[in-house]
Swiss-Prot record:
NCBIfam families: IF-2, small_GTP. Residues 379-383 are annotated as: G2. Keywords: Cytoplasm, GTP-binding, Initiation factor, Nucleotide-binding, Protein biosynthesis. The lineage of its organism: Bacteria, Pseudomonadati, Pseudomonadota, Gammaproteobacteria, Thiotrichales. It comes from Francisella tularensis subsp. novicida (strain U112). This is Translation initiation factor IF-2. Its main location: cytoplasm. GTP binds at residues 354-361, 400-404, 454-457. InterPro entries: DNA-bd_dom_put_sf (IPR009061), EF-G-like_DII (IPR053905), IF2_II (IPR044145), IF2_N (IPR006847), P-loop_NTPase (IPR027417), Small_GTP-bd (IPR005225), T_Tr_GTP-bd_dom (IPR000795), TF_IF2_bacterial-like (IPR000178). Belongs to the TRAFAC class translation factor GTPase superfamily. Classic translation factor GTPase family. IF-2 subfamily. Gene3D superfamilies: P-loop containing nucleotide triphosphate hydrolases (3.40.50.300), Putative DNA-binding domain, N-terminal subdomain of bacterial translation initiation factor IF2 (3.30.56.50), Translation factors (2.40.30.10), Translation initiation factor IF- 2, domain 3 (3.40.50.10050). Pfam families: EF-G_D2 (PF22042), GTP_EFTU (PF00009), IF-2 (PF11987), IF2_N (PF04760). Residues 354-361 are annotated as: G1. The gene is infB.
Length: 846
């Protein structure tokens, strides 16, 4: 045998060079590269190692054979025992296979050497004949083994047809290689088919059919071939049945009805929908809707429910419930650990309250030594002002709230954010409605009150009257044995102002006001607005911690980073401690007044929490709008077409003013006409507001704001009128007038004249004619009349004739005689009165 290189051997055996080198090394043949040659002795050693490895049967061998080019047969062979090398030939012809394989490998190797050395075409023909010989041997090997009565299975060694066919591929063309592969597979396929139980059963069936005189089997169609392939897969290579084929079972979904009712524990979160609740209780959504209907609530399966309603439904249907804590994220983010910080004393936050024009802002103006009132429209405070005042005895933070009725919510918000309330009462006016309301807010917030009796410089001032009126409302002065300090002041002359500040500081010492000056800041939004060029601006009162420029803050549903801070004097500052009012810029939107302000370290968490709060508000609003009760629905039946609607688009300068105006206008609604504020916001009137007004036929109202140029042009084109106001009373009065114009006028009767019957005449043309004297007003021919007898109406109709002597008259005045003929009525008697009236339209007023 000629020498061969490692690379040539790897090419002939279709192996990687590295893998072949590792295999040679495992057999004890050390080769380092593909150019190294293999001696005949090394080749012999290699063959011996391969044969010894082949003597041990593998655990499992799976081969695949294609049938008719479309179907495929997988043949699986399992061996459990070691094949003996020397077994008698008559026991099994297959035991000679290892020696024949060795001879075949040697012959193929010789053929490879010959093909390498010669390019003769005749040699290629001899190679083909050698392949035919190998195919014949393979066919003999694949013949079925003769079985005895015990059906003894002999082990068949592994047959590698691919190795036999492909070892001399270098000398053959591509078509010859393909032909060799097809021939080998065909031989093996026939061998397997003749050795299967299926083949034997087919032959038995054919023989029985011939004996019975049948025509035999028809040619199998593709469906039968597919079935044949499936049958063959159930047999192994030796005809042994692997297992009984069973038709695939169709999975049938079944439901066993429970004998007893299952009590489930339902987790309820805020805003759960009807469909979600039904799914958690394993019932249909229609069942939940039915329960809601019985409770007097109309709902759909997609409607959100509040937790209280969901709890009632769960209990009604016999289940248990647990409440889901949706504030876990908020508690984790907003909770600040201040255990390592110390508290320090802080300045008191004082809110000035009182009735309109009682001098609240004037008093604060004197304290600050500035002219704030001059800047207020009409001298009326329109929104909360936060100011910090330094005195000789310490600093005081003042919150100035509006006093008129519209700003109830703003006064309530001021009371919640304050430590002390200064109740300003005019000495010449006494206790007024907003004074009582301020007392209620202060008591509800449990805030101590210091009463400032203002305008004592006026001659008509009566402080004792104020004290007695407040005492009737349970505000008892210290001089009467109570706990409320009364101070007489004059915002005009400054009398008593120092005593008032001293009383406030004394009250703050009693309260022992403290706060944390370190750590993340907390506070409350006093006011917010949208400014051109600056964006959302919020006035914030810091209550704890230290607010610094650059902090990430969360205010209600808005978040952002503090880009700039200004104090009450308009100066830029970098940090603000407790009880300090500041103006901040950098929020994503305009927060609502009264929202809590917290500093959050992670901006991503702040954004996530703001989105969660916004979603909750939307869901709550939708749930409130959609929850119609049967009683309201029945009450509103028949009123839909009667009620007039005044649609308004409201824009204001600050959030608090817009909120107050909105509440005041909504209170004006009656059964006949209602106010519908379809949109409200802060900032200038824009073109989008005009477009909305045109689409909804609404009135655009601006409070301390104006329309931009684009909105003005669009308004001129579409015929939209803007109404501007800077005093809230004027706005409310004009809206009242507009609502009155929408009301249908009332019809009222007005008596214009009375005639007394003195004598009755008979006329062939008109019947009874009453000779009358006009004793009051004017009797007109065209007006309706009533006939009164003993001051009781006995007839109502019209006049047929009115004459003065013999002439027809259109009217007869007081003190003159006339003849009156009543149409379709002849029972006129002496002493009766004929009352003449007219119907006039009177405009309704709210």
């Amino acid at each position: 045998m000629a020498e061969i290189t490692v690379g040539q051997l790897a090419q002939q055996t279709n192996k990687e060079v590295d893998a072949l080198l590792k295999q040679l090394k495992s057999f004890g043949i050390e080769k380092s590269s593909e150019k190294d040659t293999l001696t005949p002795a090394e080749m012999k050693t290699l063959l011996e190692k391969i044969n010894s490895a082949k003597n041990t049967a593998t655990r499992k061998k799976v081969t695949s054979v294609k049938l008719d080019g479309k179907h495929k047969i997988n043949v699986s062979v399992k061996r459990k025992r070691r094949v003996a090398k020397k077994v008698e030939q008559q026991e099994s012809t297959t035991l000679e296979q290892p020696q024949e394989l060795e001879t075949m490998v040697q012959e193929v190797s010789q053929q490879v050497d010959i093909v390498k050395g010669q390019d003769n075409i005749e040699q290629i023909v001899e190679n083909k004949e050698a392949v035919k010989v190998q195919e014949q041997r393979q066919a003999e090997i694949a013949k079925p083994v003769i079985k005895d009565s015990g059906f003894k299975i002999t082990a068949m060694p592994e047959i590698k047809i691919e190795e036999i066919v492909t070892e001399d591929d270098e000398g053959l063309s591509a078509s010859d290689k393909q032909a060799k592969k097809k021939a080998a597979k065909k031989v093996f396929s026939e061998a397997v088919n003749t050795n299967t139980k299926y083949k034997r059963e087919e032959e038995e069936k054919k023989s029985k059919a011939k004996k019975a005189g049948g025509k035999g089997f028809k040619k199998a169609n593709p469906r039968q071939l597919s079935q044949l392939a499936g049958d063959l897969e159930s047999f192994d290579e030796f005809g042994a049945k692997k297992g009984k084929l069973k038709a695939p079972k169709v999975k049938k979904q079944e439901f066993t009805k429970p004998v007893e009712n299952t009590v489930r524990t339902v987790e309820i979160h805020e805003g759960i929908t009807v469909s979600e609740l039904a799914q958690k209780m394993a019932v249909k959504g229609a069942e939940i809707v039915k329960v809601l209907f019985n409770m007097g609530v109309m709902a759909t399966i997609n409607q959100s429910l509040d937790q209280d309603t969901a709890i009632l439904i769960v209990e009604e249907m016999g289940h248990k419930y647990t409440l889901h804590n949706e504030n876990a994220l908020e508690e984790a983010v907003t909770t600040v650990d201040r255990s390592s910080y110390k508290k320090i004393s802080r300045a008191p936050v004082v809110t000035i309250m009182g009735h309109v024009d009682h001098g609240k802002t004037s008093l604060l103006d004197y304290i600050r030594q500035t002219r704030v009132v001059a800047g207020e429209a009409g001298g009326i405070t329109q929104h909360i002002g936060a100011y910090s005042v330094k005195t000789d005895k310490g600093s005081i933070t003042f919150l100035d709230t509006p006093g008129h009725e519209a700003f109830t919510s703003m006064r309530a918000r001021g009371a919640k954010s304050t430590d002390i309330v200064i109740l300003v009462v005019a000495a010449d006016d006494g206790v007024m409605p907003q004074t009582e309301e301020a007392i209620q807010h202060a008591k509800a917030a449990r805030v101590p009150i210091v009463v400032a009796v203002n305008k004592i410089d006026k001659p008509e001032a009566d402080p004792d009257k104020v004290i007695s009126e407040l005492a009737q409302r349970n505000v008892i002065p210290e001089s009467w044995g109570g706990d409320v300090m009364f101070v007489n002041v004059s915002a005009k002359t400054g009398e008593g102002v120092a005593d008032l500040l001293e009383a406030v500081l004394l009250q703050s010492e009693v309260l022992e006001l403290e706060a944390f000056a370190e750590g993340l800041a907390e506070g409350v939004v006093i006011e917010s607005r949208l400014e051109k060029g600056r964006g959302p601006v919020a006035t914030v009162l810091v209550q704890n911690g230290n607010l610094k420029q650059g902090d990430n803050i969360l205010c209600g549903t808005e978040y952002g980073r503090v880009r700039a801070m200004h104090n009450d004097l308009g100066k830029k500052i970098k940090a603000a401690g407790p009880a300090t009012p500041v103006e901040i810029l950098g929020l994503s939107g305009v927060p609502a007044a009264g929202d809590e302000m917290v500093v959050i370290e992670n901006e991503k968490k702040a954004k996530e929490l703001a989105a969660q709060r916004s979603q909750k508000q939307k869901e709550a609003k939708i749930a409130q709008e959609q929850s119609l009760k049967l009683s309201n629905m029945f009450n509103n039946m028949g009123k839909e077409g009667e009620q007039q609607v005044l649609k308004i688009i409201l824009k204001g300068d600050v959030q608090g003013s817009v909120e107050a105006i909105r509440e005041s206008l909504l209170k004006l609604s009656t059964d006949e006409v209602k106010v519908d504020i379809i949109a409200s916001g802060i900032g200038a009137i824009t073109s989008s507001d005009v477009t909305l007004a045109v689409a909804s036929t609404a009135v655009v109202i601006g409070f301390n704001v104006r329309a931009d140029s684009a909105a003005k042009k669009l308004a001129e084109t579409d015929g939209v009128e803007f109404r501007y106001y800077n005093i809230i009373y004027d706005l409310i009065d004009d809206v009242k007038k507009a609502m009155s114009g929408l009301l249908s006028p009332e019809m009222k009767e007005q008596i214009i004249g009375i005639a007394e019957v003195r004598e009755v005449y008979r006329s062939s043309k008109f019947g009874s004619i009453a000779g009358c004297m006009v004793i009051e007003g004017v009797v007109k021919r065209t007006n309706p009349i009533r006939v009164l007898r003993n001051n009781v109406v006995i007839y109502e109709g019209t006049l047929e004739s009115l004459k003065r002597f013999k002439d027809d008259a259109s009217e007869v005045k007081k003190g003159l005689e006339c003849g009156i003929g009543v149409k379709n009525y002849n029972d006129v008697r002496e002493g009766d009165q004929i009352e003449v009236f007219e119907v006039i339209e009177v405009a309704k007023e709210l």
